[in-house]
Amino acid sequence: MPDASYDTIVIGSGPGGYVAAIRAAQLGMKTAVIEREFVGGRCLNVACIPAKAVLRVADVLTEVREAGDFGIKVGEPEIDYPAIMARREKVIKTLTGGVAGLFKKNGIELIEGDGGLAAPGTVTVNGNQIEAKTIIIATGSVKRPIPGTQFGGRVIGTEEAWALPELPKTLAVVGAGASGSEIASAYARLGTDVLLYEALDRVLPSEDVDISKVVERGLKRQGIQVHTSTFVENIETSESMCRFTHAGEPREVEWLVIATGRAPDVAALNLDAAGVKLADNGLVEVDGAMRTSATGVYAIGDLVHGPALAHKASDEGVIAVEDAAGLETHPIEYVDVPRATFCTPNVGSFGLTEIQANEQGYDVVVGKLQYGAVGAGTVYGDRTGLVKIVGEKQYGELLGGHIVGTKATELIQELVNVRALEGGYPEVARIIHGHPTLSEAVMEAGRAADGWLIHG
């Protein structure tokens, strides 16, 4: 049975919740975490980590198939799908076990059950009421169907898509954002016939237009049938198939994945009991220190505004705890949070797109460079990758960075760091980069923005 009171109680043990709990323990707070389902939350168990485990398999398979381009002769690789799923489970177990170990190491009590608010400073779990000076709600988000349909049968969400019982022959994905594009890219390379639908006019519609174009070409090269500006309608599911129409044309697939967004998971929190207010869009209202309208109650992650990203939730958890401890904190500049999409080709980005910068009235300067312009692009066999820097002309401000291609999800961090340290694209252009590396493409994009591109 849990103790009657704690300094800090965190509801939810995902990347936001468990990081908040560990930081609270580091600051000397008596801390407990309430988790109803699995340690590590959805990210570690059914979303981010399982997705990347399967995507890594698809990456390895692609490398084997392309080995002949590098002078290595191999036959057509054989896919062992049960082994892929077994490795996926091993990865999950390793990482969730690591989180449980960190709880133990830091003296954090894990309480299994459904946590909710009873009043300001009081939570309920398993019929017990527990007092806490600080409560942090970090319950994440849940899948959301598209209008006119519901989940069930052969209509599934992104979480189920990464744990299918068998490798499907056919699959349709509705929504070509980050999650949908990752699912489509993974299964297409594993041999599935994939249909990808997007209601807007391009894939990855939140990314810069130039990046979306490169990604769409890459997805089509993998055999994916991409349909933009298209709605899926008349969805019907049977025991073994899902039928639907697009533009009046009938289709039939083994699975239909809805990847069009998620909703905050607040149903069991009893927020009214503590006076926690929701915004019109259903998100919890918070200030820059993650404080809700209820004294001593904080909210983080997918429950609040900003991008629904694990690393953003983790940082918010630290901010909430440090504010509760009386330390100085600074609100997150959400536009500068890096985004990483692990479809092939990879995408890494932050900040404003070119269109957004122009709409906001900046005197915009753009620097672009394809990977093929630097030696490492040819060495790695990726000459079509692209680095794009969006800047402000007068002061050299770095407004946004957008990369598509090999290691884009790693390369973007350089531009994020330059921005955080108040540097601009002239600094990117002048910093010496190792040779031959893909990071030289970032440097050259900085030079292009600054008006003195060397390799181009």
Regions found by a protein language model. Give the residues of each.
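FAD-site-proximal beta/loop scaffold in flavoenzymes
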Residues: 152-168, 250-328
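Short hydrophobic core segments
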Residues: 9-11, 115, 130-140, 173-174, ...
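N-terminal Rossmann-fold NAD(P) dinucleotide-binding loop
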Residues: 17, 180-181
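Flexible, glycine-rich terminal cap/loop adjacent to redox cofactors
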Residues: 9-37, 42, 49, 53-60, ...
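Beta1/beta-strand and adjacent pyrophosphate-binding region of the FAD-binding site
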Residues: 2-14, 167-177
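Gly/Ala-rich phosphate-binding loop of Rossmann-like dinucleotide-binding domains
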Residues: 21, 25, 184, 188-189
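Glycine-rich flavin
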Residues: 2-6, 22-29, 34-167, 200-204, ...
